[in-house]
Amino acid sequence: MDEGTFLFLLDTNRAKVLSFSDFNKRNFAPFFFFFFFFFFFFSSSSRIREFVCSATWTRTRALLCTKKHVFLYCFHNTSRENRIFKANKPDVMKDGFAVYMQRATQELFFTNKLNYLLVCVPLAIISNGGGWGDGITFTFSLIAICPLAERLGFVTEQLAGYTNSTVGGLLNASFGNATEMIVSMYALKAGLLRVVQLSLLGSILSNMLLVLGCAFLFGGMSRKEQYFNAEGVMMNFGLLLLAVMGLSLPALLHFTHTELHGTASELALSRFSSTILLLIYLAFLYFQLVTHTHLYEDEEDDDDDDDEEELVLGFWDSIVWLGVFTVFISILSDYLVATIEGASASWDFSVAFISVILLPIVGNAAEHASAVMFAMKNKMDISLGVAVGSSTQIALLVIPFCVIVGWFMDKPMDLNLQMFETATLFTTVITVAFVCQDGRSNWLKGLVLILAYILLSASFFFHKDPALIGRQAASSINEWNEEF
């Protein structure tokens, strides 16, 4: 609907139009919305065919249409393309509740062969309770998180199917990062601050190189070239470079030995920088979702797929399954954090390699699957929103949030990455920004990004983290003192 000035109540027998200005003067808005929601959900009258409300305040609009869908959004822009929730979505229960349950269950658990790995969920729980060893528990937990994260991505895609491409990409990035956020919170609680830093750094690296590279590679196999909105993507890279600045300054302060008050200066600078980065992220959300939505809309595409056929879950069912999968990921994340050092000793892999490479690959399974899926459907703006948008969200939201949470938990969580990690992050952002600057992708660009990630993986395999070595040495000394 255009600039909202009327309220419409459409019935098969009558139609009534009430001037919005008169309606607002009577101050009936709160009563109207209470009555509307009560009527909307509990009315069983078959005469009502359409009930549409469009109301305008300064920057809040409500659009409610059809008897089975409620759509609320807060954009000043009221164009159809910029509505958060799409109005023309099919009823997934049109064939009956039994058919819907059968189809939803099959899609959730039996259509993807990766779901066979869900058997590792009870094995991880049994291993943790039965004392099978840290290496075995860590292995089962790591494997079990992979299908859970992928199913989280599937359910997120179902939920995103009720939204436009901008919010859909944001939803995929947000719930894709749920695994990293949960693991980080448990590691922060356990005092494994370096694991938090390295795992989040690894998430950025894997999203920008591995996930985006796979999206370019598999998307380019069926098309010679694919196109995306370069202006919106380069805005993300500008924010990523700003985040790199915020992450590198505490490290530079430390390694140049110019701190005014030693480590206290690094910690104070990290907390201040984290606050600034969080404010930047909020400003970026307003920029992305309100003032410059056109930069993040999907490019028009002639061979666009029929989204209606892909939706097998209802809106609220998708939200419920998001919660279920998140709970199981939380349980397994607790096991991961508790056994990571024991697994490092069992596998003879460094904690740094496990944190930077193995954990993010599993945690980013949701982004990996959804980004590749959207790229193969030639929806490159959503694919870029998942991969690059997820990296931006980790750099501007998750990492600063962990610093602030650590502050309240009295944990000295800071942004002091080692020089090696800072250099890898900077070179990664520059490389990917150069690849994406022309707004075009092909399979060769994807292969370049994947090979770059393999190079980084090899470098972390041979890298010794001084901070982790010192922590492990201190832990060994404490254990020796307790024994003797």
PLM feature spans:
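Long, low-complexity Q/N-rich tracts
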Residues: 31-43
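Extreme N-terminal basic, low-complexity initiation segments
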Residues: 2-12
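Intrinsic-disorder-associated, low-complexity terminal segments enriched in Asp/Asn/His/Tyr and depleted
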Residues: 11-13, 22-27
